[in-house]
Amino acid sequence: MNTNKHDIITFGRSSIDLYSQNIGAPFNLIKGFDAFVGGSPLNIAVGCCRLGLDASLLSAVGEDKVGEFLINFLTEEGVNVTNVPTKKGTRTSAVILGIEPPDKFPLVFYRDNASDSQVDIDDVDRANIPDYKVLLINGTAMNIEPTRSATFYATEVALKNNVKVVLDLDFRADQWHDYRAFGVTVRAILPQVKIAIGTEEEILAATIENVSQVEIKDQQMSAPEIKGDIDLAIKKI
C-alpha cells in the first residue's frame, strides 16, 4: 500500500507563453500578445491542483521578472513551488505563439540557457520524491544535461520507493540536436514507466529511424508531420 503523503510531483519545462492577440493574423503582422504560463509539466501541476490534488512542480526559474511571474501564478493556483529554485546566470524560458486557424499555429521557443534545463541530481534529492504517489517526467527535460541525468535519477528514486512514474513524451523537434536522439532517449526510460502520454506524432517520433520522416511546416514545433506506421510504432516501444 502506498502511504506517500502527496499526490503528484511534475518535473520539467516551465515558461511564460505569449499568445497572439490577433487571431488569424500572420506572425509578422501580430500587434500584441497575452501572457500565460506554459510547459506541460507546469500545466499538469496546475490542472491537478484545480482538480483538488496536492501537486508540486520540480523545475527552475531564472533570476528575472519572468521567473517571478511564474512563481506568482503557481502560488495563486496552489501549486507547491518549494522545488522551483532560482538558478543564477540562467533565464526563465519563453514561448511565442501565433494563432492562424484552422491549421497554422507557428511557435518559437526561447530556451538558450534555460533555467529549467539546469535542474540537477541535487535538486531531485531535495524534492523528496518518495513523499509522492506519482512522479511525472518530461521528454524535453531529457534533451540535455544536467536535466537528462536528473530525470533518470528521479525515475530510479521513484521506483525504489513505490512511486508510479508517468512519462509525458513532449516531443519538441527543435530542442534536439538530432530527431533520432529523442527516440533513443525515450526508449531507454520507457521500461521504467507505468504510463506514457503522447500524441500520435510523439509516438512516431519515439521510433524515428531517418530524419527525413519529420517535416515541420510554418514553424509548428509542437505539431510536426511525421511519416510512419502508428501501430508498428506502438509495438516497437
Task: For every predicted segment, state its role.
Residues 28-38, 234:
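Short pre-catalytic strand/loop immediately N-terminal to key active-site residues, enriched for Gly-Thr
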Residues 55, 81, 165-167, 197:
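Hydrophobic beta-strand scaffold residues
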Residues 16-20, 39-46:
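N-terminal glycine-rich anion-binding loops that anchor highly charged ligand groups
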Residues 43-54, 99:
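Alpha-helix C-terminal capping segments
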Residues 175-237:
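Conserved phosphate/ATP/ADP-binding segment of small-molecule kinases
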Residues 54-139:
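Conserved N-terminal subdomain of the carbohydrate kinase-like
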Residues 157-164:
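A short helix->loop->beta-strand "cap" motif at the edges of active sites that frequently abuts
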Residues 1-26:
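Positively charged, low-complexity intrinsically disordered leader regions
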